[in-house]
UniProtKB/Swiss-Prot annotation:
Gene: nrdE
Species in which this protein is naturally found: Mycobacterium tuberculosis (strain ATCC 25618 / H37Rv)
SS bond list: 189-426
Catalytic class of the enzyme: oxidoreductase
Means of activity regulation: Under complex allosteric control mediated by deoxynucleoside triphosphates and ATP binding. The type of nucleotide bound at the specificity site determines substrate preference. It seems probable that ATP makes the enzyme reduce CDP and UDP, dGTP favors ADP reduction and dTTP favors GDP reduction. CDP reduction is stimulated by dATP.
Domain of life from the UniProt record: Bacteria
Subunit text: Tetramer of two alpha and two beta subunits. Co-immunoprecipitates with DarG in the presence and absence of darT.
Inducers of expression: Initially decreases as oxygen levels drop, then rises again.
Residues the record lists as binding substrate: 172, 188-189, 217, 397-401, 599-603
InterPro entries: NrdE_NrdA_C, RNR_1b_NrdE, RNR_lg_C, RNR_lsu_N, RNR_N, RNR_R1-su_N, Rrm1
Organism lineage string: Bacteria, Bacillati, Actinomycetota, Actinomycetes, Mycobacteriales
Protein name: Ribonucleoside-diphosphate reductase subunit alpha
Gene Ontology CC terms: plasma membrane; ribonucleoside-diphosphate reductase complex
Amino acid sequence: MPPTVIAEPVASGAHASYSGGPGETDYHALNAMLNLYDADGKIQFDKDREAAHQYFLQHVNQNTVFFHNQDEKLDYLIRENYYEREVLDQYSRNFVKTLLDRAYAKKFRFPTFLGAFKYYTSYTLKTFDGKRYLERFEDRVVMVALTLAAGDTALAELLVDEIIDGRFQPATPTFLNSGKKQRGEPVSCFLLRVEDNMESIGRSINSALQLSKRGGGVALLLTNIREHGAPIKNIENQSSGVIPIMKLLEDAFSYANQLGARQGAGAVYLHAHHPDIYRFLDTKRENADEKIRIKTLSLGVVIPDITFELAKRNDDMYLFSPYDVERVYGVPFADISVTEKYYEMVDDARIRKTKIKAREFFQTLAELQFESGYPYIMFEDTVNRANPIDGKITHSNLCSEILQVSTPSLFNEDLSYAKVGKDISCNLGSLNIAKTMDSPDFAQTIEVAIRALTAVSDQTHIKSVPSIEQGNNDSHAIGLGQMNLHGYLARERIFYGSDEGIDFTNIYFYTVLYHALRASNRIAIERGTHFKGFERSKYASGEFFDKYTDQIWEPKTQKVRQLFADAGIRIPTQDDWRRLKESVQAHGIYNQNLQAVPPTGSISYINHSTSSIHPIVSKVEIRKEGKIGRVYYPAPYMTNDNLEYYEDAYEIGYEKIIDTYAAATQHVDQGLSLTLFFKDTATTRDVNKAQIYAWRKGIKTLYYIRLRQMALEGTEVEGCVSCML
């Protein structure tokens, strides 16, 4: 007998104080009142809390399947193929029930309507017809903890505490899929290389289909593809260039989505010195011919230092045939340092080249970003100088924060692998900075997060794309992110981008890095192994640690010194770093990559955080949510008494945002999704100035450009949801 739908006791999910009665205001109307000032000109925060309360009473409780007890519920969910039996079989039933009790005892409440709405719309387990709810937030947290802890009861308990107390939030694919029988992979996104042959192109399209089906966004490197008009088998003017491959990929992504749950999403990256660069960029023009227009793929451009230097001198910039470069140097174009070899390639008559004006190239970039928000930018030399791993980073991902080394695969004629290369998958999750600063044990919070993300890597086996599986097995790479920086700073009455704000960002990321490395070192010691290639890394040589052992890192402002002291968080000393360096050189670290800061989307609403580490876009954010229409979301910790600290990103301006990201970047081995915000008075010159400022400040990548302009609302595109946390 299936269970009946009866309202669960209100206390298990909403507020226990509800007495019922006619005439209640609809939750949607209550939420809308957040956007209206009251008679005294105050923001009505209480209306949003009431909306969350009424959402449970009017909707959630009435549509939640009722069970008499936990045993009945667990038995039903396993029997009916809702839960993965294998996950629960790793524990005694008694432990699972105790863990559920532990979660429910926390008396979790969604502080905002949008948080509750997002959770029930997008994450919770529903009946197969999609009409009724089978889980509360606590149940989802417990299933995620049980899945990631893989039988380790102590870790499962710690994970429940970290997630339900809001300190650690796994990325959408992990939080959505863990423990469910019908599910996608827990991985956020993937990066593939495409080499200059039909086998690699064909295999890449198949890989894109396979990965998109499993729920990840996929970014592909097209830099190595020979340009339009290049020879094929020595016959001139034969190659079609990169555009037809982009068209094939666009169709593949629209076909393959994760059980209809998320639109397939793809990105393609091309080097600035590829001869097809203008054709590539033109695909995003509003007036582009339909034959070449690319509507749903995201574009990224890889720019080396030399391009900026040429523009500074107002010189021409040469574009080099990847086909010729590979013939001359014996390695694919993407694996060459263009900055290093630029003049050598200019002088080499064997390499075909064309020239464009360097400043015109940057002007074109800015025009396009005005029109479409694209392309993303990866500063190639900055990225590779900061890379502690042996090898070259050639491109980034759908949200421009993953920066890992990849190697090419070689194929036989039948498309089987002659040599499996190394491609990239991103195992993501983020810390809420405010809650982490409030943690009873800061070091433990970081360690539990690192262990959770390592579990995502350990449990992922994507056999349909051997290069992704190989990369994951070799590297155990993860990306610990951060969110709620602006929320935390405002709570502590610090302005975003101020000296104190930048000082805090620097010391916080510095301290997180220390504990993340220490946790990875511990895992390496426990397991008696490290990531493949560790001995060729800057961790093994000790070079990575020099900047931490050679100078003192401490707060420059009294305010930040006090924040860490009041929180009881010890800031690592040079001696701490020396000891860690010794242990790492002796035993290694388990994870090749540890940190990456993604553009947290849905999970920051559930977790009640400001997104990533950029400023808020408005004090009360307006979102369009499916059938319900407009929904309003208040910035975390905002009250009518501290509004001055909630200046929005457009008012703050790009310099303070870049300065803040630069402070964090120096302690993050991968990238940070950095969106630039401009007022509608901005010109393409302003965009170029911001790009140059970011490059000079050591920023690794730039994500979207957003203009405060009604016509451009929505340039963020659904695309990044798959990599957004």
